[in-house]
Structure formats: C-alpha cells, structure tokens
From Swiss-Prot:
SUPFAM superfamilies noted in UniProt: Glutamine synthetase/guanido kinase
Nucleotide-binding found in the keyword field: yes
Biological process according to GO: glutathione biosynthetic process
UniProt xrefs under NCBIfam families: glu_cys_ligase
Highest taxon, organism lineage: Bacteria
Family that this chain belongs to: Belongs to the glutamate--cysteine ligase type 1 family. Type 1 subfamily.
UniProt protein name: Glutamate--cysteine ligase
GO cellular component: cytosol
Substrates-to-products reaction catalysed: L-cysteine + L-glutamate + ATP = gamma-L-glutamyl-L-cysteine + ADP + phosphate + H(+)
GO molecular function, one term: metal ion binding
Length: 518
C-alpha cells in the first residue's frame, strides 16, 4: 500500500545536505479555565498586551482561547523552549486561571454565552470579531472552542535545488509549489498515521452532543462521559471541527493556479443554508456575508499550503505572488502529556513524515479520490486501535491491515531518520522511529489509549483538571530560558501601541469599510 520510495531514499542518502536547514514553527491553542474547569469569563490577560498585534500570544475564536505562536526556527530544542517560555510567562500572569490541557473542552454548554475574541475598535479588529460571529452562527460556538496544535514546516532551498529546480529560474515558484502539493497529496493519503499515534481525544463530555442524536456507538460512563473504545481523535471527526458544507467545493491539490481558483470561487459562492441566518438582525451584523466561506481562512483542512501575507493581502493572493512557502499541518490534538501541548518526539516524527511525503510519488488526485481518502481517516479517527482494522488506497477496494501499513511506512522513515541524524549528529530521529513503531504492534502505547485509561478512571473533567493544576504549578515555578521578563513587557507595550496606531489611522466608518471587504 505504501508507494515504493527506494529510489528517492537512495537519492536522499547521496544528498544528505539537501535536508540541512529545515525550518519549522508551532502554534498551540488552549482555553483559559477556572480551578473547577469552567471556562474563564475574564478578558484577555492584561500582561499579554494586544491580542490583535502581539507577535507571540493572541486569541483564536473566543476571548478565553489563547494561542501561542513561535517564530520560525531551525532548531527544535530552541523552538520548544521558546514555546515553553510563552507558557511560563502566561501561567504567572493569569491569576488563578489555568490552561486546559485537552483538545476537547468540558465544563461548557452550548447555550452558555461564549464571549468572542475582542480586538479593539479598528476596522481590522472589528472584522476579526465579526468573522467569529459568523462562525458561531454557522457552526455553533462550542465546536469553535476545540483546540489543537499547528506545525508549520518548510524544506530548505537546497532541497529543491538538488531535487528538481533551478531556484533562480522563472518557473521556480511553480516547481517548488508542485513539490509542496505532492507533500499535501501524500498527507491526505497517509496522514491518518498522525491521529493513530498522537490523537488524544477519544472521548467527549455529554454537553458536547447537546442532546442531538448520533449514529456513533458511544459507550457512556457514570459521570456522563461518552467514548468510543478504539477512537483516537474525535476532534477530527464530524463531531469536532469539520465542515460538511465544504465537502463538495471540489478544491484540489494538484496545481497552484487550480487550487487558488477553487478557493477564490468558494468565497464568492452563495450558500442557501447560510443565507437563512441573515446578514443583520436588530442592527447587529451576524456574518461577513452568506457565501460558502466568509473568508479564505474558513476553509477547513487538515493541512494547508501557506505563504506569509503582506499587509492587506489574502492568503490566496500571497500564494499567487510567490508560490507555496511552507506547509501548515493541522491534525495534531493537544498532547495532554506535555505542559506545552506538544513535545520533541512529535516534532521529529513530523519532520520525518513531511520529508517522506516530499519524496514519495504522489499521483494527481481528483476531488472524488480526495473524498475517498476521508474513509481511511474516519476509520482511524473512530476506531484506529481496533484489532484487525484495515485501510484502503483511495477509492480502490483492496484492503491492508493498519499495523502492517504503519510498519512499512516506518521502514522508510527509519532511513530518512538515519540521513537527518547523519547531518545533525546523534541518533535522535532514529530513537523516535524505534519508540513509535512499537505502537503498531501495541496500540496501548498510543496517546489515545493512554489518555482514555485516565478518563475512564476520573472522567474528562477530572483528568483535565489534574493535568491543568500540575502544569500550572510546574510552569509558574520554572525560570524563563530564552525570553526575559523585560522582553514580554516590551512586546506588551509595543503591541498596545500598534493597536492604538491602527485605531487612530482608521478614518472610514466600519460599515463603509466592510462593504469593500465583504
């Protein structure tokens, strides 16, 4: 089932320097909660400055949903320590609140008024909050409080230069983008390995179902927790953050211009369903517009092609201007076993898997095959640890045992690991392969199995509160390592100044400004 990568691996072993200079970055979301696990109702902590303009700490959907962002980094240890510093400083500056250590929220009901993230009075800030109002009215606020980790990854120019392209040539943008689309297609075909190993949301609190019927065969504990015994990541299931209305958009990942055209089409396509919500009610705006996507960011995807945008530029226009610059992997649940929600083993695994995806052959993929890849993902998400589970290739009928496919993949990853270790020194990547491959013979080693054991004992709430308390105490005690207290104070002041400048510079009324941007 795994493509034959032997020639590409042999090429890599002859050109190990092509992997020198991999760059990556991390984003981690987490809900601020009170000691009893309920969602915090306070505003964004003052010490963290402006959520609109802060370089490292912002908010996602809700005012209580923190998001930590590391700068682009070539050093894994440095990146993780930077992320830990962001958590340490925040833990010391959020009073008695703590960070929820799980992807799925618990003590939270749909009817509860979840305050949307607030970004001040500038037109840009108000637009961001209005976008969130639209998300709430379209999908419900509860779904939007699910949190995850995003891993951003780029291969060095030396890789593309050696592999395919004269990077000074006029078609370099297209060729490098084609290389990243190959990564994306392979990710759709084989990325289910990520929830298999690292999915950590096998259960949900009963409030999450909101009394709606579900066809999933949930088992229920006395404390009202619903779980599937072999599930890995309910966050990635239809219960979690997915968007059914987008499934027939027909966006494909074969070509830069085709992809951008599909995205631009979706933000112009009217939706009957969202038109029913209305645009305004009693003088209050309910969504930016009633199209299938209000803006491009609303496209739900487990992986995204990205380029850093310039001021006022849309993500797709940035891609058209310069091609794909990096890939954003969006399928990681919060790692409950790490105080910062992600660890070195996961980052090293993703490095290996992304390199493998760049090497493995990836035939073009129609929108119907893209839909077929969802079958494998759903199997792994809902019953990934089930004995005898099989997976298929695209829309073909042949089936292969998951443990065998996993071990075949790791045979290739081990060779990538040897190459990466040869240029970095040590055996860190090979060690990760040896640790993780064991999960295919023994699913009890996976994150989902480990966290489910705890949840069955103490419930999601009990598990979440215990980890949150332990991590709060740990992070508050640890000294900063890379950033200093004064760096945070300076960034707080600078972010507040930047927000102030944006608000002062806006002369156009929001309603007029919005007509141009909606």
């Amino acid at each position: 089932m795994i493509p034959d990568v032997s020639q590409a691996l042999a090429w890599l072993e002859k050109h190990p320097q092509a992997l020198k200079g991999i760059q990556r970055g991390l984003e981690r979301e987490t809900l601020r909660v009170n000691a009893d696990g309920t969602q915090a109702t306070t505003g964004h902590p003052e010490a963290l400055g402006s959520a609109l303009t802060h370089k490292w700490i912002t908010t996602d959907f809700a005012e209580a949903l923190l998001e930590f962002i590391t700068p682009v980094d070539g050093d894994i240890e440095h990146m993780l320590t930077f992320m830990r510093d962001l958590h340490r400083y925040t833990a010391r500056n959020m009073g008695d609140e703590r960070m929820w250590p799980l992807s799925m929220p618990c003590y939270i009901a749909e009817g509860q008024d979840i305050e949307l993230a607030q970004y001040g009075t500038s037109n840009t800030g108000r637009f961001k909050t209005l976008y969130r109002e639209g998300l709430k009215n379209r999908y419900g606020a509860l779904m939007q409080t699910i949190s995850g980790v995003h891993y951003n990854f780029s291969l060095p120019m030396a890789f593309w230069q050696a592999k395919c392209c004269d990077i000074s040539g006029t078609d370099a943008k297209e060729k490098i983008s084609a290389g990243y689309f190959r990564v994306i297609r392979n990710y759709y075909r084989f990325g289910w390995v990520i929830p298999y190993l690292f999915g950590a949301s096998p259960a949900i609190c009963s409030s999450f179902l909101q009394g709606k019927p579900t066809s999933l065969p949930f088992e229920k504990t006395e404390c009202g927790m619903y779980y599937l015994p072999y599930a890995t990541s309910l966050r990635l299931s239809d219960l979690g953050y997915t968007n059914k209305s987008q499934s027939n958009l027909g966006i494909t990942f074969n070509d830069l211009y085709e992809y951008v055209a599909g995205l631009k089409q979706a933000i112009k396509t009217p939706s009957e369903e969202y038109a029913k919500i209305g645009i305004e009610k009693d003088g209050k705006r309910l969504q930016i517009n009633s199209n299938v996507l209000q803006i491009e960011n609303e496209l739900y995807a487990p992986i995204r092609p990205k380029r850093v945008t310039r001021s006022g530029e849309s993500p797709s226009d940035a891609l058209l201007r310069g091609g794909i610059e990096y890939i954003e992997v969006r399928s990681l649940d919060i790692n409950p076993f790490s105080p910062i929600g992600v660890d070195e083993q996961q980052v090293r695994f993703l490095d290996l898997f992304m390199v493998w995806c760049a090497l493995a052959d990836a035939p073009e993929m129609s929108s119907s095959e893209l839909a077929c890849t969802r079958v494998n993902w759903n199997r792994v998400i809902l019953e990934g640890r089930k004995p005898g589970l099989t997976l298929g290739i695209g829309c073909e009928t042949a089936q292969f045992p998951l443990p065998q496919v996993g071990k075949d993949l790791f045979r290739d990853l081990k060779r990538v690991a040897q190459t990466l270790d040869s240029i970095n020194g040590g055996k860190a990547y090979q060690k990760v392969c040896d640790e993780l491959v064991a999960c295919f013979d023994n699913p009890d080693l996976t994150f989902s199995a480990r966290i489910l054991r705890s949840m069955i004992d103490t419930g999601i709430g009990g598990t979440g509160k215990a980890f949150a308390e332990a991590y709060r105490n740990l992070l508050r005690e640890e000294p900063l390592e890379i950033l200093r207290e004064e760096d945070f104070v300076a960034e707080r002041e600078a972010s507040e100044r930047r927000q102030q400048e944006m608000e002062t510079a806006d002369t156009e009324p929001f309603a007029v400004w919005l007509e141009k941007h909606a």
